Amino acid sequence: MAKKALINKAAAKPKFKVRGYTRCQRCGRPRSVFRKFGLCRVCFREMAHAGELPGVSKSSW
């Protein structure tokens, strides 16, 4: 889990646009966040396996 101060800092609008960054909405992780879902890869995988993300299925080829 990310520190609350860092989550609040990321939520605030930065002075310059390029300083803004995405964080996982569930755990606050700053890296590897899917913009479409707003989740990091770890949370995305957990929720997909639990069937909590509609329209997401495991691919196989």
From Swiss-Prot:
Obligatory cofactor(s): Zn(2+)
InterPro entries: Ribosomal_uS14, Ribosomal_uS14_bact, Ribosomal_uS14_CS, Ribosomal_uS14_sf
PROSITE patterns noted in UniProt: RIBOSOMAL_S14
GO cellular component term of the entry, any: small ribosomal subunit
Protein's UniProt keywords contain Membrane: no
Record note on cofactor: Binds 1 zinc ion per subunit.
Keywords attached to this entry: Metal-binding, Ribonucleoprotein, Ribosomal protein, RNA-binding, rRNA-binding, Zinc
BP GO annotations: translation
HAMAP family the UniProt entry points to: Ribosomal_uS14_2_B (MF_01364_B)
Self-association and partners: Part of the 30S ribosomal subunit. Contacts proteins S3 and S10.
NCBIfam families: PRK08061.1
Functional description taken from the UniProt entry: Binds 16S rRNA, required for the assembly of 30S particles and may also be responsible for determining the conformation of the 16S rRNA at the A site.
Protein name, as recorded: Small ribosomal subunit protein uS14B
